[in-house]
Swiss-Prot record:
GO terms of molecular function: adenylosuccinate synthase activity; GTP binding; magnesium ion binding
Naturally occurring in which organism (per UniProt): Erwinia tasmaniensis (strain DSM 17950 / CFBP 7177 / CIP 109463 / NCPPB 4357 / Et1/99)
Positions of substrate binding: 300-306
Name by which UniProt lists this protein: Adenylosuccinate synthetase
Subcellular localization(s) per the UniProt record: Cytoplasm
Pathway: Purine metabolism; AMP biosynthesis via de novo pathway; AMP from IMP: step 1/2
Cofactor section: Mg(2+)
Length: 432
């Protein structure tokens, strides 16, 4: 039987998942997105050419791979069409390779308007959303008033449902947020113009994946954002609106939970975060600036500067627990090149002076936390593009080994550059 592998982030997103998914799809037959929306930003560099994907799975660039958007994804028709056009203009036959669950909730213009209005109303307490309507779309889904891809099969019913839900949301926009109403006729016309394209890509995803599993095809599940942004297990309320953890694979795709064989956690060699929220190891000094500059830490989706800091092994251990991680892929090791010393957070000192090795559950619990560091020697040699473990400086190997020791999880893959070729696979997830 074929192996089913999950690839997800262990931190606050931006760990480098896209490149690793693209690399591993050389063997996969299917790549599945199971949560999030076009708030994700997965950057791939292949033969020097850069591709940024927000909604379509990273496997779309491979000709023998089927890409699937599962029911756990909130789908913006406008964003999908834009992304499809960009890929098709470059010669990728997206409509032959991409399929969509009819249960995907739709993100429409009023969701974006609500997202923006709410962030503005929060003022200094803004969460730092991407402003793309993700949260309001998930809210509609849970409230059972959301429109889904499958609703487009009956255009008259869709129009009636849209009118009802827009009356509700426009009332909020105008009377509570003092914002402009969203035009119903425009929203309807925009969706109807591409409805047939969307419905033409619909499949029964659960049935498709179960058949693939029984045939022994290799399936990869591509996570978006990161564990610490999970709606339930993240730094609430500074989180995204979906389950970014491994548990979201089954609910967001329709595959049974027993059929996940290996969970690969992507861990950046240091920490970054976009937007507001707790970040115990954040650096505000020259080292923080160094990490930002060397790592080109600007969001692929928003362009915002990412906050930077040392690797937080306490937070990563939480990701190990929640996701039952099988192994790590460490990315951006080369960004640490040239530092005289490298620090690793192994515990927290609480405001009362006590030391803990677990993370708080709510954002308030993080207040006043001080990181407790181990300091390791840095290295002056370059690790960029190194393709063998023996080719790494001894200090870099010692750092990797220490991360393995404090987390209890092996580093199975090491990324030393943005190109898919700049990677060493010590243990292939599909063979583990």
């Amino acid at each position: 039987m074929g192996k089913n592998v999950v690839v997800l982030g262990t931190q606050w997103g931006d760990e480098g998942k896209g490149k690793i998914v693209d690399l591993l799809t050389e063997r996969a037959k299917y790549v599945v997105r199971y949560q999030g929306g076009h708030n994700a930003g997965h950057t791939l560099v292949i033969n020097g050419e850069k591709t940024v994907l927000h909604l379509i799975p990273s496997g779309i660039l491979r000709e023998n791979v089927t890409s699937i958007i599962g029911n756990g994804v909130v789908l913006s028709p406008a964003a999908l069409m834009k992304e499809m056009k960009g890929l098709e203009d470059r010669g990728f036959p997206v409509r032959e390779r991409l399929f969509i669950s009819e249960a995907c909730p739709l993100i429409l213009e009023y969701h974006v308007a609500l997202d923006v209005a709410r962030e503005k109303a929060r003022g200094a307490k803004a969460i730092g959303t991407t402003g793309r309507g993700i949260g309001p779309a998930y809210e509609d889904k849970v409230a059972r008033r959301g429109l889904r891809v499958g609703d487009l099969f009956n255009k008259e019913t869709f129009a009636a449902k849209l009118k009802e839900v827009m009356e509700y949301h426009n009332f909020q926009l105008v009377n509570y947020y003092k914002a402009e109403a969203v035009d119903y006729d425009k929203v309807l016309a925009d969706v109807m113009a591409i409805a047939d394209i969307l419905t033409g890509m619909v499949v029964d995803v659960s049935e498709l994946l179960d058949g693939a599993r029984q045939r022994g095809d290799l399936i990869m599940f591509e996570g978006a954002q990161g564990t610490l942004l999970d709606i339930d297990h993240g730094t609430y309320p500074y989180v995204t609106s979906s389950n970014t953890t491994a548990g979201g694979v089954a609910t967001g795709s329709g595959i049974g939970p027993r059929y996940v064989d290996y969970v690969l956690g992507i861990v950046k060699a240091y920490s970054t975060r976009v937007g507001a929220g707790p970040f115990p190891t954040e650096l505000f000094d020259e080292t923080g600036e160094f990490l930002c500059k060397q790592g080109n830490e600007f969001g692929a989706t928003t362009g915002r500067r990412r906050r930077t800091g040392w690797l937080d092994a306490v937070a990563v251990r939480r990701a190990v627990q929640i996701n039952s991680l099988s192994g790590f892929c460490m990315t951006k090791l080369d960004v640490l090149d040239g530092l005289k010393e490298v620090k690793l957070c192994v515990a927290y000192r609480m405001p009362d002076g006590s030391e803990v090795t677990t993370t708080p559950l709510a954002a308030e619990g993080w207040e006043g936390i001080e990181p407790i560091y181990e300091t390791l020697p840095g290295w002056s040699e370059t690790t960029f593009g190194v393709k063998t473990l023996d080719g790494l400086p001894q200090a870099a190997r010692d750092y990797i080994k220490r991360v393995e020791e404090v987390t209890g999880v092996p580093v199975d893959i090491i990324s030393t550059g943005p190109d898919r070729s700049e990677t060493m696979i010590l243990r292939d997830p599909f063979d583990a």
